From Swiss-Prot:
Belongs to the nurim family. It is found in: Nucleus inner membrane. The chain crosses the membrane at residues 3-30, 57-78, 97-113, 133-161, 189-207, 214-231. It is a multi-pass membrane protein. This is Nurim homolog. One of its GO terms (cellular component) is nuclear envelope. Residues 31-56, 114-132, 208-213 are perinuclear space. InterPro entries: Nurim-like. The lineage of its organism: Eukaryota, Metazoa, Ecdysozoa, Arthropoda, Hexapoda. Residues 1-2, 79-96, 162-188, 232-253 are nuclear. Keywords: Membrane, Nucleus, Transmembrane, Transmembrane helix.
Amino acid sequence: MTSIAKSIVLLASLATFAYSLYVVGSLMMFLSTPRSISKAHTWIFNLLDNKSRLQTAYGPVVFDTLYLIGFIFQHSFLKSAVVKKLLAKLGLSGAERTIYSLTSSLCLHYLIVNWLPAQSIVLWQIDVEQSAPLWWTFVITHGICWVVIFGGSLVMDLPELLGVKQAYYDLKAYGPPISYKSGELRNLYAHVRHPSFVGLSVILFATNVMSVDRLVMALLLTTYMYLAWSTDQKDVAYQKIQLQRKKLELKAK
């Protein structure tokens, strides 16, 4: 690409960075806002006594599942070797991560905006608004999980995670940012590129109203994360070594 084209890619990556943060903020509100209690519900164990509730949940669950499958497909397909080779042939290697981040954010934003609740069937529901201890427990639990996720994103180099650093390095004719990292860290990033499987899983399942649509989302996304994040013993050993080094550094101070 010419320097002008690379500059445009860099500007696009900065815009994508800002948009991605906005979408993540929307996701926080979507997943972590306490849900209101509906009196018109059927416990999931009593479906045989009230089949009409099951029928009204069909439509939302089908559409929500399609939204999730679309997001998962995009998230996996754009990481494939086929897409990477195509972008390389088009001279867009420096924009690869930006394109990935932008399309991921668009799919996630579409899912959030168009999500259809199916609260006629619930697995459990807790009215946290009527109890200050329960409300604070819910808020603090989700808050800690989000702090862990954002902290992990910063540790994993957020500008690189969202594609800004790749576009900048390409403009400056540097090598890819990942090439400046150790082999062990590159191996870890190849296996997991988002922080905190546990944090995301807790956020998905620790809801005060576990309706059938939320259950479908929690099950599909945690299953996808479990299958996609394939860390091995080398990754675990590397992280243990880094943790020990950090402890020694803190003691030295």
